[in-house]
Amino acid sequence: MEEYDYSDVKPLPIETDLQDELCRIMYTEDYKRLMGLARALISLNELSPRALQLTAEIIDVAPAFYTIWNYRFNIVRHMMSESEDTVLYLNKELDWLDEVTLNNPKNYQIWSYRQSLLKLHPSPSFKRELPILKLMIDDDSKNYHVWSYRKWCCLFFSDFQHELAYASDLIETDIYNNSAWTHRMFYWVNAKDVISKVELADELQFIMDKIQLVPQNISPWTYLRGFQELFHDRLQWDSKVVDFATTFIGDVLSLPIGSPEDLPEIESSYALEFLAYHWGADPCTRDNAVKAYSLLAIKYDPIRKNLWHHKINNLN
């Protein structure tokens, strides 16, 4: 704040000073001064370097203040138009934003602001965004805001070349990382028209290998189902996938449905759920689906028994 003079600005009040307020917020004097100055400058529509500095000070103490983010964007857009080098100016703004991002990993205003800056940028670069994205996901591999922004970047730049390998690395690190599995599916959905049969076969093997490592992991089973549905018109894997899934349920389908105590343990309830869904799509195998859902309700996933009964009723 020392760099700029605000003595000509009369701060506007941020408190009502009404009688008998139910819960008066105890603002610090510094906070009231910052917000009062901001209100005054916004009312004057001042788009200046000192206004930009003020927004940085406020974001430092109140990083979720959407109005200030919007005001900062208006300032940046105006000052960019007066800059001799708009690329350099916006890159400096992105550098500042990187620091704010690292200190506020759960702040969602940051990401919409980044999007607005990239849309404004004459020559935006996905390569420039990758380091900050990696740092943020390394810090919290399930940070929803970061994953959403990464998806946005892929679509904005029409660039998916890094995504499959990146998702693979994260899955190798943590096979339960559902965010990485979801991002992997995002890649296939957007690249499906340029994928070869060999690549599809390799991906199917990748999925089965990961299931083999941890059969009772819902993420790859859900992914397998989505992958099969996405490419059902290009490859016929039904028998291979069914044979693979049945290796995790033993001979439970050949046994009479009795009490839970009489039924054996199986390696994966998610394999049984996958098979039930698969069999339910074919009238010739619906009896198998009904039995699989019944087994899930009775023994292998009773916490969701109402769901399994609902699915049985739909089949019947």
UniProtKB/Swiss-Prot annotation:
Pfam families: PPTA
Catalytic activity: L-cysteinyl-[protein] + (2E,6E)-farnesyl diphosphate = S-(2E,6E)-farnesyl-L-cysteinyl-[protein] + diphosphate; geranylgeranyl diphosphate + L-cysteinyl-[protein] = S-geranylgeranyl-L-cysteinyl-[protein] + diphosphate
Gene Ontology molecular function, alphabetical: CAAX-protein geranylgeranyltransferase activity; protein farnesyltransferase activity; protein geranylgeranyltransferase activity
E.C. no: 2.5.1.58, 2.5.1.59
Keyword Transferase: yes
Cofactor dependence: Mg(2+)
Alphabetical GO biological process terms: peptide pheromone maturation; protein farnesylation
GO cellular component, one term: CAAX-protein geranylgeranyltransferase complex
Enzyme class (EC, first level): transferase
PFTA repeat feature ranges: 47-81, 89-123, 125-159, 160-193, 199-233
Compartment(s): Cytoplasm
Domain of life of the native organism: Eukaryota
Keywords on record: Cytoplasm, Magnesium, Prenyltransferase, Repeat, Transferase
Metal-binding among keywords: no
Function recorded in the entry: Essential subunit of both the farnesyltransferase and the geranylgeranyltransferase complex. Contributes to the transfer of a farnesyl or geranylgeranyl moiety from farnesyl or geranylgeranyl diphosphate to a cysteine at the fourth position from the C-terminus of several proteins having the C-terminal sequence Cys-aliphatic-aliphatic-X. If X is Ser, Ala, Met, Cys, or Gln, then the protein is farnesylated, if X is Leu or Phe, then the protein is geranylgeranylated. The alpha subunit wraps partly around the beta subunit forming part of the active site.
Similarity section: Belongs to the protein prenyltransferase subunit alpha family.
Record's miscellaneous remark: Present with 396 molecules/cell in log phase SD medium.
Subunit structure: Farnesyltransferase and geranyl-geranyltransferase share a common alpha subunit (RAM2). Protein farnesyltransferase is a heterodimer of alpha subunit RAM2 and beta subunit RAM1. Protein geranyl-geranyltransferase type-1 is a heterodimer of alpha subunit RAM2 and beta subunit CDC43.
Descriptive protein name: Protein farnesyltransferase/geranylgeranyltransferase type-1 subunit alpha
Organism: Saccharomyces cerevisiae (strain ATCC 204508 / S288c) (Baker's yeast)
Upper classification of the organism: Eukaryota, Fungi, Dikarya, Ascomycota, Saccharomycotina
Gene giving rise to this polypeptide: RAM2
